[in-house]
């Protein structure tokens, strides 16, 4: 990871949030704001692995019980010496922390009895499990204070109701107060409650209630404000923005304030983990927030998850960890340094599209994009993006740069390209990808139909071309000449027409 800023980019369900939660859990011992011991449940375990375990039991095998292991490897810093050792899965001498959820040996016999009938098992019986929290020196960790660094997890979007949002901000404000300020605020709040009883109208009400003594109770009844410990100032104080309760301002403003406050009061934190800072924010507001995060990062290590190409551009592609299918890679992992430089300079939108797509189709320009989009819709009854397939228009000179990322991410990618009158040249250009399991080069071998337009004429014939374009060309050559000179308009006509037409075979292969 980078020492300062790390932007984690990936599709939904790829594990971005899990990564942040795992780091925070290993360093704090807390999940969802509470100790792990009270937040343990069977669904913390990977469902596929649990199913595999149950299937193995059903097959008569004796697999090792499912377990969870989190390891956080830290920099070899003198301040972390007491965490240093080789008690980790890599067996390297480094500072670090491990947290495991594993079968408790004292319950091993009960566990074996429980799993003796695999047909009755659906989830992991966590009642037989224990939590083991240790540093790499092999010493048990009793409390997060035993770890000389602190992590703050900021996910304002999880606060769905007003009460939770208010408590969240009050807790942050409380952290920023000195001990004396907390005492002063608590005392002032109690005095304010005491003055409630001095109000004339309250006295009148209590005098009337006192007359009911003996009718309802033998004791005198009165009304007052709760001054018990449960009614502390934290429960009664509501944060305001310009005299409006925080819970009543816009969601975007709420989230921005929560993130900023958390960063301000996390000055002692060494690691800050921010979940999707862009939630509910406009372009301008997001710009201001990202600027604030960058300016206030200091020497702290920051992790931000995002789907936003703007965040990618603002914070820099060099900070990005491309996360997919539970693993992450960086652009610095690319073997070709010129490709690294290219994507460092390129606006992040197209890069993000390639990262987030389940499958991508790279085309040479807007005309090809329209034809591929419409061809896909005609075949599947919906647009490519509805299937997680992104059609990306790329300068032909940049094709191979995008393919390097596709191979790095193992993202299935089709290249729809012209043969430009030289199949041999095309094969030489993509020689490294012709046998790839990830990348497929789609082209036509007919060198006389070297671009999209003659390919459309070749596939559909002059009659269909005239019907689509609303023209009366008498020969294919004049039709092709017109189509080449009016690429965008022609592609749009093909996209919008109700006339039945077919895509060239090499495009059909890509929209399978």
Say what each PLM segment does.
Residues 42-59, 336-356:
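Surface-exposed acidic, glycine/proline-enriched linker/cap segments
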Residues 69, 75-203:
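Electropositive, glycine-dotted interaction segments
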Residues 350-361, 369-512:
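Acidic, Mg2+-coordinating catalytic modules of nucleic-acid enzymes
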Residues 61-65, 89-92, 124, 263-267, ...:
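Conserved catalytic network of the ASCE P-loop NTPase/AAA+ motor domain
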Residues 66-70, 92-97, 126-129, 149-150, ...:
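Short glycine-/polar-rich loops that comprise or flank the Walker A/P-loop
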Residues 22-91:
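Conserved P-loop NTP-binding catalytic core
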Residues 99, 171-257, 261-271, 295:
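Extended helical coiled-coil dimerization/tether regions that scaffold
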Residues 1-28, 232-353, 369-370, 374-380, ...:
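Switch/communication elements of ASCE P-loop NTPase nucleotide-binding domains
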């Amino acid at each position: 990871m980078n020492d300062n800023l790390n932007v984690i980019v990936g599709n939904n369900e790829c594990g971005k949030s899990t990564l942040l939660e795992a780091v925070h859990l290993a360093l704090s011992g807390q999940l969802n704001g509470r100790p792990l011991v009270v937040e343990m449940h069977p669904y913390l375990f990977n469902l596929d692995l649990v199913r595999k375990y149950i299937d193995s039991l059903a097959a008569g095998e004796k697999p090792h019980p499912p377990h969870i292991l989190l390891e956080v490897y830290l920099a070899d810093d003198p301040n972390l010496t007491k965490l240093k050792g080789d008690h980790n899965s890599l067996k390297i001498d480094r500072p670090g922390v491990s947290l495991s959820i594993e079968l408790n040996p004292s319950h091993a016999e009960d566990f074996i009895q429980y799993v003796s009938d695999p047909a009755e098992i659906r989830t992991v019986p966590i009642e037989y499990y224990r939590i083991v929290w240790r540093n790499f020196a092999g010493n048990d960790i009793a409390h997060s204070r035993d770890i000389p660094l602190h992590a703050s997890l900021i996910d304002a979007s999880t606060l769905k109701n007003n009460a939770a949002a208010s408590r969240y901000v009050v807790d942050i404000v409380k952290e920023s107060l000195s001990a004396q300020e907390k005492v002063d605020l608590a005392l002032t709040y109690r005095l304010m409650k005491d003055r409630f009883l001095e109000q004339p109208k309250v006295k009148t009400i209590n005098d009337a209630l006192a007359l009911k003594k003996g009718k309802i109770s033998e004791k005198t009844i009165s009304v007052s404000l709760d001054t018990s410990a449960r009614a502390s100032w934290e429960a009664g104080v509501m944060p305001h923005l310009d005299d409006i309760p925080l819970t009543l301002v816009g969601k975007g403003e709420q989230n921005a304030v929560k993130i900023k406050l958390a960063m301000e009061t996390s000055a002692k934190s060494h690691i800050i983990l921010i979940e999707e800072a862009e939630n509910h924010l406009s372009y301008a507001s997001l710009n201001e927030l990202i600027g604030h995060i960058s300016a206030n990062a200091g020497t702290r290590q920051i992790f931000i998850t995002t789907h936003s190409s703007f965040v990618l551009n603002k914070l820099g592609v060099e900070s990005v960890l491309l996360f997919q299918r539970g693993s992450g890679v960086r652009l610095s992992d690319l073997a070709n340094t010129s490709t690294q430089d290219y994507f460092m300079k390129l606006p992040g939108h197209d890069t993000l599209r390639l990262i987030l797509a389940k499958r991508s189709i790279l085309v040479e320009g807007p005309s090809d994009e329209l034809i591929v989009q419409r061809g896909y819709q005609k075949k599947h009854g919906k647009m490519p993006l509805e299937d997680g397939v992104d059609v990306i228009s790329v300068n032909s000179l940049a094709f191979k740069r995008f393919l390097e990322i596709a191979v790095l991410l193992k993202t299935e990618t089709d290249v729809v390209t012209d043969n430009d009158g030289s199949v041999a040249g095309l094969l030489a250009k993509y020689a490294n990808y012709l046998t790839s399991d990830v990348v497929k080069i789609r082209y036509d071998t007919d060198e006389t139909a070297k671009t999209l337009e003659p390919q459309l004429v070749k596939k559909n014939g002059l009659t269909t071309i005239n019907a689509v374009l609303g023209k009366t060309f008498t020969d294919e050559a004049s039709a092709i000449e017109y189509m080449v000179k009016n690429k965008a308009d022609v592609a749009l006509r093909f996209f919008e027409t109700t006339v039945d037409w077919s895509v060239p075979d090499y495009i059909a292969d890509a929209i399978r």
